Regions:
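Gram-negative bacterial Sec-dependent N-terminal signal peptides
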Residues: 1-22
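Copper-binding active sites and cupredoxin-like electron-transfer domains
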Residues: 20-347
Length: 347
């Protein structure tokens, strides 16, 4: 009886979509693009490095708003609205005290008007009204980065939730005057939701559902733009004992994230993305609301695959999981898997 219970439990664990073979960094479940279909996934490593220590400067940041048909899942496409053709939009890095010039160009082929509202801005609409651009137009404004932190930006053209759900969000980091402590690896991860008329898992080109958007019932949850985007070739990679920093944000537009890395504990959490308050320490899971962000740091002492999830775990089966693959020597003093004595007894 005991053996049967153990066997049943083992089978159930293996069946979990974010376990066993699904944890491999070489997993091919990441959406594969076809001819005429864009790869909208923003690599978690696609972010500029730390700024050199310097005084305030004038910094120009340009955005192109592009509407593209992209791969949402294998055999499934969706019409995305994007900043620079990827989801999330580009990671912007400036310094406290910088004067930042934002220039937004709406692509000639766009159907919709677009703009940008940056939560780092002190001024009306976060720049949204100043950058409202019809297809083919360019708009710009400047602002002074007054307060350090990690901030969400997004399109704020009505219907705002629709523009965000279709992929128009990103992060801007305002480094404090002295910069941030040096780390070995930095990653850029954002969570979002996609609302389609068709049920999750449907093949072909899907259409957005305003009804489901208003009811807050997404068919897909995504990291960096697509279902299971941060797996396979897009898995995050690190070495044992490296200090890892993740800049994490939630575009939403509606759902709060309980961000967690299975098998790890966050050594530091810059809660609510405040870079001036003392960080929390030894945290298992963080709560990040739509339009919010956080910065987490940790070391992976033991090699292997670590799974990025929202701990509302049903969402993993709708596309919300990623892999951090850590390479290095085994650490049996920290983590040791006992031999399968049951299997040995039957041989």
């Amino acid at each position: 009886m005991k053996t049967a219970i153990i066997a049943a439990a083992a089978a159930a664990v293996t069946a979990l979509s974010f376990s066993a073979a699904a944890l491999s960094a070489t997993d091919t479940s990441v959406p594969q693009t076809e001819a005429g279909v864009a790869n909208v996934i923003r690599s978690a490593t696609d972010l500029p490095g730390p700024l050199a220590k310097r005084g305030p400067e004038h910094v120009k940041v340009s955005f192109d708003t592009v509407e593209v048909t992209g791969a949402l899942a294998d055999g499934t496409t969706y019409r995305y609205w994007t900043f620079d053709g990827k989801v999330p939009g580009p990671f912007v890095r400036v310094r406290e005290g910088d004067t930042v010039e934002i220039e937004l160009t709406n692509d000639d082929d766009s159907v919709m008007a677009h703009n940008i509202d940056l939560h780092a801005v002190t001024g009306p609409h976060g720049g949204g009204s100043a950058t409202m651009a019809l297809p083919g137009e360019t708009r710009s404004f400047t602002f002074k980065a007054l307060q350090p932190g990690l901030y969400v930006y997004h399109c704020a053209t009505p219907m705002v939730a629709q523009h965000i759900a279709n992929g128009m969000y990103g992060l801007i980091l305002v480094e404090p005057e002295g910069g941030l402590p040096a780390v070995d690896r930095e990653f850029y991860v954002m969570q979002g939701e996609i609302y389609t008329e068709e049920a999750h898992g449907t093949k072909g080109e899907l259409t957005e559902s305003i009804e489901k958007l208003l009811d807050e019932q997404p068919e897909y949850y995504v990291f960096n733009g697509a279902a299971d985007a941060l797996m396979g070739d897009n898995a995050l990679k690190a070495k044992t004992d490296e200090t890892i920093r993740v800049y994490f944000g939630v575009g939403g537009p509606n759902k709060t994230s309980s961000f967690h890395v299975i098998g790890e504990i966050f050594d530091k959490v810059y809660n609510l993305a405040s870079l001036t308050a003392a960080p929390l320490t030894d945290v298992q899971t963080i709560t990040v609301p739509p339009g919010g962000a956080a910065v987490v740091e940790f070391k992976a002492e033991v090699p292997g695959p670590y799974v990025l999830v929202d701990h509302a775990l049903s969402r993993a089966d709708r596309g919300l999981k990623g892999i951090l693959q850590v390479e290095g020597p085994d650490r049996p003093d920290l983590f040791h898997v006992a031999p399968d004595e049951t299997k040995a007894a039957h041989n």
